[in-house]
Design a protein with these regions (language model features):
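Glycine-rich, small/acidic residue-mixed loop/short-helix segments
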Residues: 127, 132
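CN hydrolase (nitrilase-like) catalytic-core segments centered on the catalytic cysteine
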Residues: 39-125
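Active-site catalytic loop in hydrolytic enzyme cores
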Residues: 1-51, 64-73, 140-143
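A conserved C-terminal secondary-structure "cap"
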Residues: 134-157
C-alpha cells in the first residue's frame, strides 16, 4: 500500500501468497480464513462461501488512512457477497515502527449489518451471532446458489 503521506507498507515483505483457500469446521459452522490484504480479493471470499463457509475470519492491520476509506465498506461487502458472518479483529494504535493502525474490530452479519464495532481503542468485544441468519439471508438473496463462472469478456467493436 502506498499512502499519499509517502508511507509504504508491504505485507509481501513478511507474507507470501497462499496456494489454496482454507476453511475449517468449528462448533459455530464452517469458518473461512483470510488475512488483511486478502480482503481486497472478492474472488477469494466467493471461493470460501462456495466451500460452505458461514463465517469469515479476517484479522488485519489496516493503516488509519486505508482503514478510514475502505475498512467498513469492504468488510460489509464481503459479508453481503458471501452471505456469511465476518469476524475481523483489527490492530489499533501507534506502533514503534511508525505505523498508526485503524482498529475498529468488527463483527458483521450476513445481511451486512455491523453487530460490533470496537472503535479505535484496544479492548475485548463480544457479539451474539444468530446462526440461523446465514440460511435466512441465503434464502432471501440466493447469490451463492446463482453464482457461476464468468464467461470470457468480449471487447465491443
Amino acid at each position: 500500500v502506498d499512502l499519499p503521506t509517502g508511507e509504504r507498507w508491504r505485507e509481501s515483505a513478511a507474507y507470501t501468497a497462499g496456494e489454496t483457500a482454507v476453511v475449517a469446521d468449528t462448533p459455530i459452522g464452517r469458518l473461512g480464513l483470510a488475512i488483511c490484504y486478502d480482503l481486497r480479493f472478492a474472488g477469494l471470499f466467493a471461493a470460501l462461501s462456495d466451500a460452505g463457509a458461514t463465517a469469515l475470519s479476517i484479522p488485519a492491520a489496516f493503516t488509519r488512512p486505508t482503514g478510514a476509506a475502505h475498512w467498513h465498506i469492504l468488510m460489509r461487502a464481503r459479508a453481503i457477497e458471501s452471505a456469511a458472518f465476518v469476524i475481523a479483529a483489527a490492530q489499533t494504535g501507534e506502533h514503534a515502527d511508525g505505523r498508526a493502525t485503524y482498529g475498529h474490530s468488527l463483527v458483521v452479519d450476513p445481511w451486512g449489518e455491523v453487530l460490533l464495532d470496537m472503535g479505535a481503542a484496544p479492548g475485548i468485544g463480544f457479539a451474539e451471532l444468530d446462526l440461523g441468519a446465514v440460511e435466512a439471508v441465503r434464502a432471501r438473496v440466493p447469490v451463492i446458489a446463482h453464482r457461476r463462472a464468468i464467461p470470457p469478456v468480449e471487447i465491443a467493436p
